[in-house]
Regions:
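C-terminal helical cap(s) of enzyme catalytic domains, especially alpha/beta-barrels
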Residues: 27-52
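Nucleotidyltransferase catalytic core that binds NTPs
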Residues: 56-299
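Active-site-adjacent loop and "lid" segments of alpha/beta metabolic enzymes
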Residues: 1-16, 52-59, 68
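Glycine-rich phosphate-binding active-site loops on the catalytic face of alpha/beta enzymes
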Residues: 9-33
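Short, solvent-exposed amphipathic alpha-helical segments in soluble enzyme
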Residues: 2-6, 37-42, 276-280
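Hydrophobic faces of well-ordered beta-strands that scaffold small-molecule active sites
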Residues: 1, 14, 21-23, 260-262, ...
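Conserved structured core elements
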Residues: 4-7, 34, 266, 270-273
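Catalytic cores of large soluble enzymes that bind and process phosphate-bearing ligands
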Residues: 2-5, 25-36, 239, 243
Length: 299
């Protein structure tokens, strides 16, 4: 961790017209050469930030800021710039409220996790019919943020009859009865899938796996905000899974601000490697994020 005097020396050097910093001792024989380069790189990058530095000097917040996990230099999350984080640690509070419950399958559980951990930012919950129409017709959420695929929770008429029109319910894992999280219901609506299938999938062929799923999943949809129980996530999270918050912290810690994203459903091969290397070269990126498609496969 650099001292205030060391930070002041670097900032003063830059403010006086210096075009480079030599880190002879620490980078050559020190215990933390990579970390040293990272923090100095950040000081250089942030030395023009008027919030913390003024006329080559730093204020009392500067050291804490430079050593914090601030995401100021990383591109803002999609939408209004705020990463959606909707988790609940106090599961007992919801247990004693004796709320209605709804059993959900693996696909819906996956959506609850992705929404609540911010993967689907700026989406905060399952869509209502009006929002589905906006997405399919205009590629826009009701907030006017760009979005291209409906995220829905379909249920049967039998389940719909048990739910309140508004308010909180507990979401239950249909496999083992574990409590997944809470859904704060905005609406329960009759859903005519035939009105959406063509624009959704580009076909009405009932052999199409997506079409078949929508037709068979029930003729009601529930919209509302999702919240994930931390206790459930701790039980189910795989060691290779990273949330958006975690990946952003990794980017910051490594001093990466320009990152190439590569989304794939296949094991990377030579063709992928060529594309990835070219993308890194063209964009002069700091790193590449490999984002594999995982989960339930289409059959």
């Amino acid at each position: 961790k650099p001292t205030r005097a060391e930070i002041n020396d670097i900032v003063s050097t830059l403010a006086s017209g210096g075009s480079g910093i030599v880190l002879a001792a620490e980078t050559a024989i020190g215990k933390y050469p990579v970390d040293c380069v990272r923090i100095v790189s950040r000081i250089i990058r942030e030395s023009n930030n008027p919030k913390y530095f003024s006329n080559g000097a730093f204020n009392n917040q500067s050291v804490d800021y430079l050593l914090s996990l601030s995401m100021d230099g990383i591109i803002k999350p999609h939408g209004k710039g705020e990463l959606v984080q909707q988790s609940i640690s106090n599961i007992d509070y919801y247990t004693i409220k004796n709320l209605p419950s709804l059993k959900i399958n693996d696909k819906t559980i996956s959506d609850v996790i992705q929404i609540s951990e911010g993967v689907y930012t700026p989406l905060t919950g399952f869509m209502c019919i009006k929002e589905i129409e906006s997405v399919l017709s205009n590629n826009k959420l009701l907030t006017d943020d760009s979005w291209t695929l409906p995220i829905v929770l379909q249920i049967t008429q039998k389940d719909a009859a048990k739910l309140p029109g508004k308010g909180e319910i507990i979401l239950i894992d249909s496999k083992n009865g574990e409590r997944v999280g809470v859904l704060d219901i905005q609406s329960v609506e009759k859903f005519n899938s035939g009105n959406f299938i063509k624009s959704w999938f580009g076909t009405e062929d009932k052999n199409h796996p997506g079409v078949k799923e929508i037709i068979n999943n029930g003729n009601y949809i529930v919209s509302g905000t999702t919240f994930l129980f931390n206790s459930y996530r701790q039980q189910t999270k795989m060691h290779h899974e990273y949330s958006p918050k975690q990946t952003r912290e990794i980017f910051y810690h490594n001093g990466w601000y320009n990152i190439v994203g590569f989304h794939t459903r296949n094991i990377p091969h030579t063709g992928h490697e060529h594309i990835q290397i070219k993308a890194l070269e063209i964009s002069n990126a700091d790193a590449i994020l490999l984002s594999p498609v995982t989960g339930i496969k289409k059959t």
